[in-house]
């Protein structure tokens, strides 16, 4: 697929067909692609956790997500939970933040990788 077409056809999915299942291999491919996203000073602070079991999916959906997002993931066959290692991206080796954004750099990088 041509890159411009990929960009133009990108969508935020908010309704899932419970009959359609994503395979573990497809999930691995998505996470592998995200890992190649650039990060602040190549700090690579993104972490990915995949929720495949229905019991854990429901627990995360009902106990961890805001109501709007909990409703949006109904019917999805998996959740990919993303997190960032704190106090690394946006920080110098001395442990001091590079600027006022501090941990914001890691969150920013994670958002870009998730796209």
Label each PLM-derived region with a short phrase.
Residues 18, 37-38:
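Short helix-to-loop capping/linker segments positioned immediately adjacent to catalytic or ligand/cofactor-binding
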């Amino acid at each position: 697929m041509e890159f411009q077409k990929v960009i133009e056809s990108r969508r935020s999915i908010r309704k899932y067909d419970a009959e359609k299942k994503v395979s573990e291999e497809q999930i691995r491919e998505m996470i592998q692609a995200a890992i190649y996203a650039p990060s602040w000073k190549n700090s690579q602070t993104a972490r990915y956790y995949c929720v495949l079991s229905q019991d854990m999916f429901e627990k995360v959906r009902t106990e961890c997500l805001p109501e709007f997002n909990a409703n949006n993931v109904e019917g999805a066959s998996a959740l990919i939970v993303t997190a960032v290692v704190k106090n690394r991206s946006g920080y110098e080796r001395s442990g001091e933040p590079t600027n006022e954004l501090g941990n914001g750099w890691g969150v920013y990088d994670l958002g870009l990788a998730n796209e």
